[in-house]
Swiss-Prot record:
Keyword Transferase assigned: yes
Molecular function per GO: nicotinate-nucleotide-dimethylbenzimidazole phosphoribosyltransferase activity
Superkingdom of origin organism: Bacteria
A Pfam short name: DBI_PRT
Active site residues according to the UniProt entry: E317 (proton acceptor)
Protein name: Nicotinate-nucleotide--dimethylbenzimidazole phosphoribosyltransferase
Gene (name only): cobT
HAMAP family: CobT (MF_00230)
Amino acid sequence: MKLQWWQGPCQPLDHVARTKAESRQQQLTKPAGSLGRLEKLAIHLAALQGRERPSLDKLWIAIFAGDHGVVAEGVSAYPQAVTGQMLANFVSGGAAISVLARELDAALEVIDLGTAEPLPPLPGVRHLYVGAGTQNLAREPAMTLSQLLICLEAGRDSLLRARAVGCDLFVGGEMGIGNTTAAAALACWLLGCPASELAGPGTGLDGAGVAHKARVIDAALALHHAQIDGPLQALVHLGGFEIAALTGAYLAAAQQGIAVLVDGFICSVAALLAVRLNPGCRDWLLFAHHGAEPGHVRVLQALGAEPLLELGLRLGEGSGAALAVPLLRLACSLHGQMATFAEAAVAQRPQ
């Protein structure tokens, strides 16, 4: 059987660079281990970048957007029109991720994979019309296999554009009213959990709304169970265009040797799908935060992930990942710019 592109090998970590970075950490003017996880982050980034002193100068943020047919089941507190409206807000500079991208001097790419309401061409938005959003996963498969493949490739293509300009850290974000329902459904399938354990408020549902959302997800899982035989079919039946694109981007990043900072619940579900499709990509994924959606912690546990922040976030857009970028940059700066004991003429601890 012919291998698909996402099954190709991921780049190996550079163990020589890791060893050099570990040695450097032992020589810096501080007690060994006193910077905690910042030391481990710098060492891991050294292994990813293949250099003793890593840096994160070029940040690429890609926002993938798409609508969800399951909104017809009353699973969101916001109307579906918001997806398209937010695309305009992203490129006009008014969204949270727009502000964060400016502050971080990051490239921001916005990709429209298909909104329910047709949009005029928006300057600064890449319009890739895969469909008028997904179908209602509570009633039928969310998308066709052809649509899934297009979305996976859309994620890969964004990553390749990032690589072409020398990106050294990729952040994926998402926008799509109803996408926490799709993400929770996928997480339930991936983890074998009932929806009552993973469904959350999304954009702001109350307790009754969350309970209804869980019932919709459980019904969808029962409807599609017999047809799902792996991650790709899970995406076809339960996924979203933007979730598939994120999955493709994460896989391509590992194949191209670019570190990824994963955002919240939806992005973490895409990361788990990517790891299930190609386990070698796991080393290239860093996890920004533990968000407020109840399913997020379960997905992070399945990935063996240690998130950097816990701020009660549930916005999406890549915002939590963007907030964690300064922490990674400071870890690199401390590692690369602190003096060694020899350089500073500081006495070391006696052996």
